[in-house]
């Protein structure tokens, strides 16, 4: 299907699938300006990760250098072009029948992977989580349907790859095998009680700042 909005065209195709017994919505979302979005993030990455401007790309490891600032910014304030994703996030919520948008808060961030960067096994606070790959370099993300499950589901990434699923699912991803930077954005959709829980538990020694970077989801979906 194709959308036309904000002086861009968007080709997209989303499918409802399963990871074990859990919901997965996955597919491609390809705006006509995806390359420009990628270049803008690469060129301005130091605004969110200061050491990315002073460290060699091949030596830069943002969890080590800039972990304290990893979630200290409102991603959509820095990179407003990413707001084009919200009609598709709303479509996912509608598909799963979760349409009480007023109860949710939205948080997103940018993942910048130089060569060799990866993410280790983890999950998220919130009800829903997903990611959108702006530029892939041949990586795969693996999911476990249950925390102690032996079953593993592999999702091969690509430019424009979009996912939406329950936030509690454990996942990890393979290292970036190329010199080019792999760029993606991740997002969580949480109740305010979950935001407070993450803040109070000070998860990863930065949870106390979560309240400053969440946005009421209804304000982003343009619904009353």
Task: Outline where the language-model segments fall.
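Non-heme Fe(II)/2-oxoglutarate
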Residues: 2-97, 118
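Positively charged, low-complexity intrinsically disordered regions
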Residues: 9, 36, 45-46, 123, ...
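Intrinsically disordered, low-complexity segments enriched in small/polar residues
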Residues: 18, 25, 184, 205-206
């Amino acid at each position: 299907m194709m959308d036309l909005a904000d002086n861009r065209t968007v080709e997209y195709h989303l499918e409802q699938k399963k990871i074990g017994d859990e919901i997965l919505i996955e597919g491609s979302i390809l705006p006509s300006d995806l390359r420009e979005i990628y270049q803008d993030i690469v060129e301005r990455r130091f605004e969110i990760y200061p050491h990315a401007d002073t460290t060699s790309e091949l030596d830069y490891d943002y969890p080590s250098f800039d972990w304290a600032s990893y979630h200290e910014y409102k991603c959509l304030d820095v990179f407003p072009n990413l707001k084009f994703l919200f009609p598709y996030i709303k479509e996912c919520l509608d598909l799963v029948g979760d349409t009480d948008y007023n109860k949710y808060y939205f948080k997103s961030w940018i993942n910048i992977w130089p060569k060799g960067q990866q993410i280790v096994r983890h999950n998220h606070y919130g009800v829903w989580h997903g990611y959108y790959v702006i530029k892939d370099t041949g990586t795969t993300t693996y999911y476990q349907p249950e925390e102690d499950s032996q079953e593993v589901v592999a999702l091969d990434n690509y430019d424009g790859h979009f996912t939406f699923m329950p936030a509690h699912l454990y996942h990890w991803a393979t290292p970036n095998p190329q010199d080019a930077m792999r760029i993606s954005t991740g997002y969580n959709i949480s109740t305010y009680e979950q935001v407070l829980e993450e803040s109070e538990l000070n998860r990863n020694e930065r949870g106390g700042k979560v309240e400053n970077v969440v946005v009421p989801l209804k304000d982003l979906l343009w619904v009353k």
